[in-house]
Amino acid sequence: MKYLALLPIALMLGTPAIAETINPYQEKGCVYDGDVGKDGKPSGKGTWKCQDGRSYVGSFKSGKFDGKGAYTVSGNGETFIEPFSSNSAKLRNMTLEGMFKKGKAHGNFTASQNGTPVFIMKCEDGMIKEVKLPKKSASKTK
């Protein structure tokens, strides 16, 4: 069984006041811009971006990815597929689109690389439970 080790997704915040842009991530090279709850943590729609190229656009709840969203690792970052074996890979320019629950991948996801779907997966509590190749579109022949 394969596991997806998403780069640290849990977002811990200690921000004062409600604001649209939160910078406590600066020490980690990340910035959040979006809706904020009464507790000062991201809640609702927002964008989280890091200097190393990681980003998340989607829903947040209590400072964590929660709901529909897209997590992207640019050419500067890496996403690892485990366990490490001949099938393991460091994936760059990957986007994982789907549902998150309490900061972890949960539900159906499409993994794309450079805009092309690479595989479809089902996750449960951050663990990959099922992986399928995307269906190829029928080519037109004359």
Locate predicted features:
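Sec-dependent N-terminal signal peptides
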Residues: 4-13
